Amino acid sequence: MTAAPSPRCDRITELTTDQLRARLPEALQIYVTAMGYPPTTAQQRAPMWSAHMLRAGWRCIGAFSDHNELIGIGYGYLGAPGQWWHEQVRRGLLASGGDSGGWLDDYFELTELHVYPGSQGAGLGEEILRRLLAEAPGSKVLLSTPEGPTRAWRLYRRVGFADVLRNYRFTGDPRPFAVLGRPLPLEPADSAPAESSGRNYRARNTDG
């Protein structure tokens, strides 16, 4: 039996809140497939993703196949006191003696970044990341990603993300996470081929 060809990217574009709402089932399907989560996770995450669209500075980038299927998604917004992720990171930085005021001021939170597994391996994750951050508000960007030698780590290091907090455990998740950050804007991409996208491109897995 011949395998179906992998979807190829035809266009990458910014999405409005209305456009993402219309594509939310597709976006969440990419999320659970790329992360290997149970299908029921999509339904649980839908209200959270919808709430994030209302936050200041929210912007979203989508990648589409030549059949107009969503195959990649990335979004984020301005971090602020009172947000669950902000308070978790602040607590971790204070406990570790880190500079919470320096990082947690005027920053863009890279919340989600995912590529459909069949479309990984051609640098699509990096392209979405760069498009998302090209006009992101804030003087810096922060994200969290599970600890471990993943493609996500190679991507983030390649574009200049540095350690902010390591081996941190967010409330409700036993896995160790790293919080990474860097100033904005990004430098232009060099001429080296982009590494493949990976299932752990996801910036983090829990927020309120």
Residue ranges of model-derived segments:
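Conserved active-site tyrosine of GNAT-family acetyltransferases
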Residues: 31, 156, 161
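Active-site rim helix/loop that mediates acceptor-substrate recognition in acyltransferases
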Residues: 38-71, 75-81, 98-99
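Short hydrophobic/aromatic beta-strand element in the GNAT-like acyltransferase core
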Residues: 57-62, 73, 107, 112, ...
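Conserved beta-strand-loop-alpha-helix junction that forms the acyl-donor binding cleft
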Residues: 115-120, 133, 142-153, 169-176, ...
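Helix-loop element at the rim of GNAT/NAT acetyltransferase active sites that forms part
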Residues: 28-42
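Conserved acyl-donor/pantetheine-binding loop and adjacent beta-alpha core of acyl/acetyltransferases
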Residues: 75-112, 171-173
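Conserved N-terminal entry element of GNAT/NAT acetyltransferase domains
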Residues: 1-22, 190
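Conserved acyl-CoA
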Residues: 98-104, 108, 114-117, 127-140
